[in-house]
Amino acid sequence: MLTSGIVILSGGLLDPNPGLIFWTAVTFVIVLLILKKFAWGPILGALEEREKAIQSSIDRAHTAKDEAEAALRKNKELLTKADAEAEKILREGKEYGEKLRADIVEKAHSEATKMISSAKEEIEQEKRRALDELRNEVADLAVQGAEKILMANLDADKQKAIVSSMIQDLSKHRN
């Protein structure tokens, strides 16, 4: 029926229509088959490719992480060895420095002792030489005094004057 340009269908929206249900089901199955044939395969293939790429990236990341951890452990070991070696070198250098210092001090002490000994010996020689010289002068003066006394048989006052004169001569010779 047609009333004022509007077609009124009989039945409501909630009333089951077997023809509509059949054609809806057939259309759904056809669309499902078309999607399965043309879209489902490529979509699943793309998803599988993406999954493989992600898994490959994860595997590479794990491998890189393991390699980095191994390198880090190796670097830590090398650093520990280098620290130990540096400490050993410093300790050996310190020991060598101490030994060298002790050797230098001992050598300087030995040289100082030698120099002191040499200086003492030289002083002793100079002292002996001066004493020998003094003895010779005293002996010469005594001989001269004895000569003068013997030559001049003089009285006590003159002898005292001669001895005083000799003492003055002795003082002059010493200076």
From Swiss-Prot:
InterPro entries: ATP_synth_B-like_membr_sf, ATP_synth_b/b'su_bac/chlpt, ATP_synth_F0_bsu_bac, ATP_synthase_B_chain
Transmembrane segment boundaries: 20-40
GO MF terms held by the record: proton-transporting ATP synthase activity, rotational mechanism; proton-transporting ATPase activity, rotational mechanism
Main location: membrane
Membrane topology classification: Single-pass membrane protein
Presence of keyword DNA damage: no
Subunit field text: F-type ATPases have 2 components, F(1) - the catalytic core - and F(0) - the membrane proton channel. F(1) has five subunits: alpha(3), beta(3), gamma(1), delta(1), epsilon(1). F(0) has four main subunits: a(1), b(2) and c(10-14). The alpha and beta chains form an alternating ring which encloses part of the gamma chain. F(1) is attached to F(0) by a central stalk formed by the gamma and epsilon chains, while a peripheral stalk is formed by the delta and b chains.
Similarity-based family: Belongs to the ATPase B chain family.
Biological role: F(1)F(0) ATP synthase produces ATP from ADP in the presence of a proton or sodium gradient. F-type ATPases consist of two structural domains, F(1) containing the extramembraneous catalytic core and F(0) containing the membrane proton channel, linked together by a central stalk and a peripheral stalk. During catalysis, ATP synthesis in the catalytic domain of F(1) is coupled via a rotary mechanism of the central stalk subunits to proton translocation.
Name of the protein this chain belongs to: ATP synthase subunit b 2
Organism annotation: Prosthecochloris aestuarii (strain DSM 271 / SK 413)
